Amino acid sequence: MPLAGAGPPGDTRGMNDNVERHSRSEDVQALLSGTLLIALGVAMFTHTGLLTGGTAGLAFLLHYATGIAFGKLFFLINLPFYWIAWRRMGRVFTFKTFAAVALLSLFTELQPHVLTFDALHPLYAAVAGGLLCGTGFLILFRHQASLGGFGIVALMLQQDRGWRAGKVQLGVDCVLVAAALFVVDPERIAYSLVGAVVLNMTLAVNHRPGRYIAM
């Protein structure tokens, strides 16, 4: 069944009629705060040489394997996912996702000018960065938005089959981390795996169907 008119992932069908919807100002606040938290987490991962997950992680691996520019790969990989989002999740979800991607790109571009780390241990970066990213994604998900890519598929599977979005994303990230063993230092891979677990367990614990029914 099309999801264009459905609530956020975790929708409980039939319980949404009397649920107060998020206002536009609340959605804007959520997009800004969610992407800023993710940008902070990404900064910690980047500073310590850790890997990211999802389509960004896949684009990263393909870049090292083929030499093709990361930006081109990331754009091409995301195209089918945005098509899926438009067809299955609706234009509102797709528009918010485009906005979230643009904001994250802006924050990560400006961030080095206002944020630096003198000392940051990779383990702390993995845990704190994972929590920041997980919380940011949670905010976006609850306002019918994502950062595209595999996250869209994870949300769709949660709607259609009841699979937790966090666990689906965790499985994807674990596969990417395993593939990265061929191009990245094993120690960094281990820390990256910790970050992936923290990020996705944050979603799995806090984004359960039926617990959150606001829209």
Positions of predicted regions on the chain:
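Core subunits and conserved enzymes of cellular information-processing
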Residues: 2-5, 11-215
